[in-house]
Amino acid sequence: MCFLIEPLIKIDAKIIFLHGAVSDQRNAELTKLLLSKIRSAGKVPGMATHYPLQTIPFIHQNKLDCSAILLPFNLKGEFMGNQKAVEKLVDSLDYFFIAMKPLAAGKISPKEAFPYLGEHNISAVTVGMVTEEEILETVTEAKKVFK
């Protein structure tokens, strides 16, 4: 498996996330090695997960040097697994959580989505947008919740 950490270091990325394909293997030895490489380059190490109920406890129990966690998190529970359990887990831990899929692949409007995120321990959000209309609607609603 190829790990493209060096190119991200060269372009001066501030945070470098391990892809979910790596994080969700929950291989402590490999994960520690990659996170150490990121930290030793002076970057903030993070991990993405598509299986938060399995991978976040793995991160926490192994005391991994992971400052930020990117996970699916949205009002409808899409892509989250057990929504209530993920909410409880996120709200109970001190990590910089970043929500992905906050609009549940277009099933939730930004107006509905962002207040929900603001009720939980979500520090940032990443949203896929295609049209100018989507950009304006999403950014306008995000500014109302995230300051």
Describe each PLM feature range.
Residues 19-147:
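Beta/alpha (TIM)-barrel catalytic core signal, keyed to glycine-rich beta->alpha loops juxtaposed to Asp/Glu
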Residues 1-26:
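Active-site beta->alpha loop and helix N-cap motifs at the rims of alpha/beta catalytic domains
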